[in-house]
Amino acid sequence: MTFGFHIKSAYISAQEQFPESNPFLPGFIREYILANALGHKLNPQKKGVDAWDNLNQGVEYKTFKSGKWGRFNVEIQHGYEKHLVGVSCWYFAEFSSAFTISRIWRVEIDKISQYCKAFMSRTSKKTGHIMIDFRVKWIQENGILIDFIGNSSSSDFIRHLSNAQEIAIEQFGVSDITLKGRIREIMIAEKLGHSIIVNSKKADANDEFGNQFEYLTSLQGNFQMTHMTEDNSEAKVLRNKSIYCAQFETPVSISEIWEIEPKIYMQKMATRRPWPTDRQNNFTVRINWVRENGRCVYKLE
């Protein structure tokens, strides 16, 4: 059975529990595992609190792999305060592997607020986004270590994901499919016969001849390349032999894949340059442009 087969099975299982949700949005899988471990009710939508505890109070989740730390992405113009409204506390969960929690801490919201306020007072950055880092030492000093039920290995959703993870390791060398974009990347690579490049600072995939490729994906027909600057944009595009735009019909079904020549993509990008230095720059091309300027290499029958 293929990686895609197990991912589709996981999607069906998640839909039975959370209809109309997309279980492959960033953070969903880990938050699902954490909510089950704590006996919380997960909010399957991206907006609002992450979950509700046994007292029906809103809580926020931050998850990270062992050796890393909790991160909080703040848009400076809007401030951090709005993210703390309606939340009683934050739970930090350390994962020892893709689907296994090793430790959970609870930190009260007043301590989170104080830390964020102090962090923001020290930064000189006035626009764009900033990451507030919560190091494990700070979490240990300010949080309470929580006993938890266990992990969600018995759920059909996680069981199917675990099967997909085994294939990801064996065939693509990917040790954690919960990372942002990984599932879609592997599904595309499976269609095109490519290998995955696991280093996030490099291209997304390569072929047997060493040619590199960038993968852009969309459900709505908008294909976005993120974090563009004058220093990196040409290298991010021109290092690739091709850019592939994969249109997803559902979160687990690719309807079409189009191949774009990097030089054509650069010509389109020229209309947006030079890139401003005071904000995060994302470059988007739409499905109509892709179809007019690309070559179709896969179409769902």
Stretches with model-predicted labels:
Residues M1-E301:
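Nucleic-acid endonuclease domains
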